[in-house]
């Protein structure tokens, strides 16, 4: 099946950054095309007129993506589902439909429509034989408004609109726990995720959201911060709280995990993470980089390049729970994966 480009979700305000990243990725794959990106729309469409686009690669500023198979405009209010089913190419085959909206001020009011439309759409697709609900693939329909949608096809990974369904734990000391939880699901392969008995260092730990999640997973944690931890963590024998500067702390022995949510210039955090990996103080790291207002994509690429000079593999994403920042996962290549 020919793919006419990519449908990409992003955080509102980062459309041009994602468009630049997508254009560069397409050029690296010898795919010719152009992007349509409207400010504050929370999505970007890359068009490949030759119909030779592969499935979209992992892009830092894309929350979710799919291969574009068509754009439908002027959909009727009555019989909308049947019109979509009739317009889809037969080569779509079997896939489970996801009805999505942009995560923007204009797009969020469509959430109710998307929920209610999913049932009629599935019925129409089944009736026409376009799809039979294959759980391994997704037919993604992005609605900028109720009469206009982009249709795409992609693998099962991720969440509708790139928005994870995570609940805030009742006893967690801060909402930052959701950021680390999302990072573990999205960036870290299952056989590389933290597991009981490992040891972690949390730089910039207070009040302790990331430390709390690591303890919930059975790790012991050295929490580094001059500020106080939540009382439950301060009394936890599995947490060692050291009141010192995150940039000066050095571990006594190699640790399994380094996590860092320190607010500092991205270049400074990248240098610190690079040092930890090069000196083999940590096997793996998850850390945030605060983004500058200007040239964020260049800043991210330079930071990832610096981390990779250590021989570590690294990739990053602007998560749903990130704001003006990205989250990076890096692991030394010599580190042994859990079987």
Curated annotation (Swiss-Prot):
One of its GO terms (cellular component) is cytoplasm. Belongs to the class I-like SAM-binding methyltransferase superfamily. RNA methyltransferase RlmE family. RlmM subfamily. The active site is at 290 (proton acceptor). InterPro entries: RlmM_FDX, RlmM_THUMP-like, RNA_MeTrfase_FtsJ_dom, rRNA_MeTrfase_M, SAM-dependent_MTases_sf. GO terms for biological process: methylation; rRNA processing. It is found in: Cytoplasm. One of its GO terms (molecular function) is S-adenosylmethionine-dependent methyltransferase activity. It is an enzyme of class 2 (transferase). It comes from Halorhodospira halophila (strain DSM 244 / SL1). This is Ribosomal RNA large subunit methyltransferase M. NCBIfam families: PRK11760.1. Transmembrane segments: none annotated. Catalyzes the 2'-O-methylation at nucleotide C2498 in 23S rRNA. Monomer. HAMAP family: 23SrRNA_methyltr_M (MF_01551). S-adenosyl-L-methionine binds at residues 176, 206-209, 225, 245, 261.
